[in-house]
Amino acid sequence: DRLLIADQDRRVGSTLREYSLSGRRYLGRSLPPFKGDAEGVVLWACSAEAGYWIAVDQVRPSEFRVYDRRTLAPAGTFSGRTVADTDGIALQQDASPRFPAGALFAQHDNVAVAAFDLRDIVRALRLDPACAR
């Protein structure tokens, strides 16, 4: 029963804000402010209860922030070699020939799309290995 929305209002700090899907509005909880603009946010569901939220900080290079699905505790950050000023991200959890465990796609500088193998993210941040299956 959680929805995270990327809020870019710098007057109060660009960050993720927590809302409820059960009809209540803003729950009064915000994550720490981002350096740039809080951009796309996706839920990486590893099971019915476990997983991670991934959001992107629109800086150069883009910084991808990973949070525990249940607690919202930071699980780590990562960047790509050629990914900057990301406006949006999309998560594909289905297997494909190129990405057997799925991929995170990120818009790069309004000109291209970058892809991150979910297995690489799991390894780099020491996340739950069940998320890479």
How should each PLM-predicted stretch be described?
Residues 1, 42-49, 90-102:
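Structural signature of eukaryotic scaffold interfaces centered on beta-propeller domains
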Residues 22-29, 49-51, 70-76, 121-132:
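Beta-strand initiation motifs
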Residues 32-74:
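Loop/turn-rich, solvent-exposed surfaces of beta-rich toroidal or solenoidal domains
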Residues 11-18, 61-67, 111-124:
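Structural motif
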